[in-house]
């Protein structure tokens, strides 16, 4: 990933404007390795959540130098009472008591999210041992959606070397969050995914995917993607959008010449909007496993601050890359 267009720019921007990122699983070996690398680069400061003694013991056990980073233990955090008070205010509609808030905030995922909410950190990366829901739920409850966003969605960035020597970079969404997004949500997701892709050097050309190409098939699912594409075109006239398209018509110039010769997107799409989470999750994993793409994500979109989720099967390199991506997004929210 280091030679991906856009990634070097992220690192350079972070060197000029360093950020602080929370890792909610401070004793995990992969997190410690990534934190050590980030500290060596001097452009990102990690906060490791956990018992200080346990974190230091784990770092020594695995052989990683985390000097220069910060360890914050929920059990002895000096601003914990302030955190409880703010949590109660944020969740007052649910009638949360201080006792309930304190208990919840002893959980690293909620504690770490509140560090971002309070401005102690700029971003958060979790999920090495948590489920996606355990990372996203605190973000929805505490960070909430940014102005103009009606939903939180996700994007995967897929990268592989090409014959030209430059990496091929694609964006896909929503592959992780919304089970069955509405037409309006799909239109918004298209914009968010396209904007995310720009950070990685993508000049977005957006395809709304279906089993039909511009009316070749019929059914509610086809209508949904066609209508979503039409709404997105109306809302974002500067963004090249086509839909509905079958995947071959979206990426193959030969197929596009036959099926939709007048489209400015068909045959050259690089940003793909799936009808639901089933298609999206299957699609990016096929690209990853059979197409030899490296997949980075899910990158959460639409929040007031960068909160991102790791796969529980991630390795340290993926943690390192996602930390840089997450922190860099703090410059653009």
Feature-to-residue mapping (PLM):
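Anion-binding alpha/beta catalytic cores of soluble intermediary-metabolism enzymes, centered on
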Residues: 2-266, 271-333
């Amino acid at each position: 990933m280091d030679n991906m267009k856009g990634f070097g720019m992220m690192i350079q921007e972070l060197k000029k404007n360093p950020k602080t990122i929370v890792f909610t699983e401070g004793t995990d070996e992969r997190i410690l390795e990534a934190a050590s690398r980030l500290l060596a680069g001097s452009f990102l400061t990690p906060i490791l959540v956990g018992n200080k003694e346990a974190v230091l013991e784990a770092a020594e056990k695995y052989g990683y130098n985390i000097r220069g980073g910060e360890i914050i233990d929920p059990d002895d955090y000096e601003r914990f009472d302030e955190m409880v008070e703010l949590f109660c205010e944020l969740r007052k509609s649910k009638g949360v008591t201080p006792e309930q808030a304190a208990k919840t905030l002893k959980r690293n995922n909620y504690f770490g999210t509140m560090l971002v909410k309070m401005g102690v950190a700029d971003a958060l990366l979790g999920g090495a041992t948590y489920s996606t829901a355990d990372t996203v739920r605190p973000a929805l409850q505490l960070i909430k959606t940014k102005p103009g966003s009606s939903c939180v969605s996700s994007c995967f960035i897929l990268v592989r070397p090409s014959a030209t020597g430059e990496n091929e970079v694609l964006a896909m969404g929503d592959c992780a969050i919304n089970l069955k997004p509405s037409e309006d949500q799909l239109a918004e997701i298209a914009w968010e995914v396209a904007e995310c892709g720009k950070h990685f050097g993508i000049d977005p050309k957006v395809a709304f995917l279906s089993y039909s190409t511009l009316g070749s098939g019929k059914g509610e699912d086809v209508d949904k993607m066609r209508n979503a594409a039409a709404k997105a075109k109306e809302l974002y006239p500067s963004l090249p959008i086509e839909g509905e398209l079958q995947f071959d018509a979206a990426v193959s110039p030969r197929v596009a010449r036959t099926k939709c010769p007048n489209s400015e997107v068909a045959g050259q799409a690089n940003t793909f909007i799936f009808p639901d989470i089933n298609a999206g999750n299957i699609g990016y994993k096929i690209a990853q496993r059979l197409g030899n793409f490296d997949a980075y994500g899910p990158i959460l979109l639409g929040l007031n601050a960068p909160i991102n989720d790791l796969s529980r099967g991630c390795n340290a390199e993926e943690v390192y890359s996602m930390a840089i991506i997450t922190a860099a997004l703090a410059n653009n929210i």
